Regions:
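Short amphipathic alpha-helical interface segments
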Residues: 9-35
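Short loop/turn and capping residues at structural boundaries
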Residues: 32, 44, 61-62
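Glycine-centered, phosphate/nucleic-acid-interacting loop/turn motifs that mediate DNA/RNA or nucleotide
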Residues: 54
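N-terminal, helix-rich and Lys/Arg-enriched segments in bacterial and organellar proteins
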Residues: 18-21, 48-49, 57
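Short amphipathic alpha-helical interaction segments
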Residues: 38-49
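Non-catalytic effector/regulatory segments
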Residues: 22, 50, 68-71
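Short, cationic-aromatic polyanion-contact patches
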Residues: 3-14, 28, 58-71
Length: 71
């Protein structure tokens, strides 16, 4: 039986989101979901992980939150 760690649970998905932002630039949650095929809660978990590591920026454009990699 393999054990799931927090690092593997969120870290893997954070890597997918980071790659999506790196390749596609600033994106909405919906954009990230389409590119990565992750569920909404997985994207939010990954963004939280990346945010905790200070690797992303968030900007409001109208009512939309746009996520990008920290420059």
């Amino acid at each position: 039986m393999t054990e799931t760690t927090v690092e593997s649970l969120f870290g893997e998905k954070a890597g997918l989101v980071w790659e999506a932002l790196d390749q596609n630039g600033p994106s909405t949650i919906g954009d990230i979901m389409k590119v990565t095929t992750l569920r909404r809660e997985e994207v939010y978990g990954a963004l939280g992980w990346l945010g905790r590591e200070n690797k992303i920026a968030v900007e409001m454009r109208g009512r939309a939150k746009i996520f990008s990699l920290q420059s």
